[in-house]
Amino acid sequence: MNHLRAEGPASVLAIGTANPENILIQDEFPDYYFRVTKSEHMTQLKEKFRKICDKSMIRKRNIFLNEEHLKQNPKLVEHDVQTLDARQDMLVVEVPKLGKDACAKAIKEWGQPKSKITHLIFTSASTTDMPGADYHCAKLLGLSPSVKRVMMYQLGCYGGGTVLRIAKDIAENNKGARVLAVCCDIMACLFRGPSDSDLELLVGQAIFGDGAAAVIVGAEPDESVGERPIFELVSTGQTILPNSEGTIGGHIREAGLIFDLHKDVPMLISNNIEKCLIEAFTPIGISDWNSIFWITHPGGKAILDKVEEKLHLKSDKFVDSRHVLSEHGNMSSSTVLFVMDELRKRSLEEGKSTTGDGFEWGVLFGFGPGLTVERVVVRSVPIKY
C-alpha cells in the first residue's frame, strides 16, 4: 500500500491572507466603542478600557462589523440580550466569503488549476451551521463537488496549527493530494456593550480582529509545473497544559460568544513551553532556542513577553508575531498563518538565505482553549535570488 502514500514530508506551497476593508485605529477605539454602545456615561470603565488598549501594542485592526451594521442591528451594542440569531445570520454568510478571499490569493500564488485541489479543511470559531463554512467556501471558489472536506468549529486560537497538522497527515498519506486549508474568524460573534462586572469582555474587545488565512499543502512538489515549497512540515504535536482548565474558553450563549481569558495564561504558557520544545527538537539534536526561527501565535503582548523572558530569547525572535499583532490584532486561528506569511516575506526582503530568517529549523506554536498548545516543527527552504 506504500505506493498510495507520498514520499517525503508535506510542504506549504502557497499562503494567502485576507481582511475586511473596515479599519479601526486602536488609539481611537475606546472613544468609538463607548460611543457606539451608548456607554459614554461609564467614564471610569472607559478609562480602564483605554489603558487596556494602550498596553495591547496593537496599532490597528480590521473589523467587519461597522456602524451601519450596528444601526441595522441595534441590540448588538447591548451587553446581555438575545442577539445570537442576528449574529449568525451575518456570519454564516461572511465567514465563507472572507475565507474564499484568502483561498483565492493562495491559489493564485500556487499557480495551479483549482481542479488539482483534492481536500479542503476549514476552521472557524465565529459561526456554526449546516452545511458548514467549508461547503459554502467550496461553492464560492468553484471547487470540484467531489473535493474531500473537513469542517472544524470552535477550535479558537490554536486552530492554525491544527489545520496544518491535519493537512500534513492527509498530504503524506494520499499520493498527489493537494490540501487547501483555511482559517477564518470574524469577531461580530462577541461584540457587545461593556459592563462593570465583565472586565474579560473588555480585553476581548481590545485585542481581537477579523481575518482569514489559507495555505496549500502537498508532498512531492512538482517543480516542472512551477510548484515551490515555502516551508516543510516536519512533525506535529498537541498537548493540554497541566492545571490550565478554564483559563481560556468561549461559550455560545443567546447573547453571542462569551469569552473567558484568565490572567495566568501568559505564565502557564511560558512555564510549560520548553517541555514542548524539548519533545519536538530532541530527535533533531537542537536545544538552543535562539538557533531556530519562531512562528508564534501572538495571543497578546504578555504571552510573547513571558515566553521571550523564560527562554532567554533574542528580541528579534518574535518580530513577525509582534508585527502581525500590531497591524491586525489577534485574529484567532488565522493569526499564526499571517505570522508565517510575514516571516517568509520579510526573509526575502531582507536578503536572508532561507524562508526562515536564515535559519534551517523552526517551530510554529498555537495557543487556545483548553489550555491547548499546538506545535509544528518546520523546516525552511533556501531562497534563490
From Swiss-Prot:
One of its GO terms (molecular function) is acyltransferase activity, transferring groups other than amino-acyl groups. Its main location: cytoplasm. It is found in: Cytoplasm. Gene3D superfamilies: 3.40.47.10. Keywords: Acyltransferase, Cytoplasm, Transferase. It is an enzyme of class 2 (transferase). Disulfide bonds: none annotated. CDD domains: CHS_like. The active site is at 157. One of its GO terms (biological process) is polyketide biosynthetic process. Expressed in glandular trichomes. One of its GO terms (cellular component) is cytoplasm. It comes from the Eukaryota. InterPro entries: Chalcone/stilbene_synt_C, Chalcone/stilbene_synt_N, Chalcone/stilbene_synthase_AS, Polyketide_synthase_type-III, Thiolase-like. Its EC number is 2.3.1.-. PANTHER family: CHALCONE SYNTHASE, HYDROXYMETHYLGLUTARYL-COA SYNTHASE. Polyketide synthase responsible for the biosynthesis of secondary metabolites. Belongs to the thiolase-like superfamily. Chalcone/stilbene synthases family. This is Polyketide synthase 1. It comes from Cannabis sativa (Hemp). The gene is PKSG1.
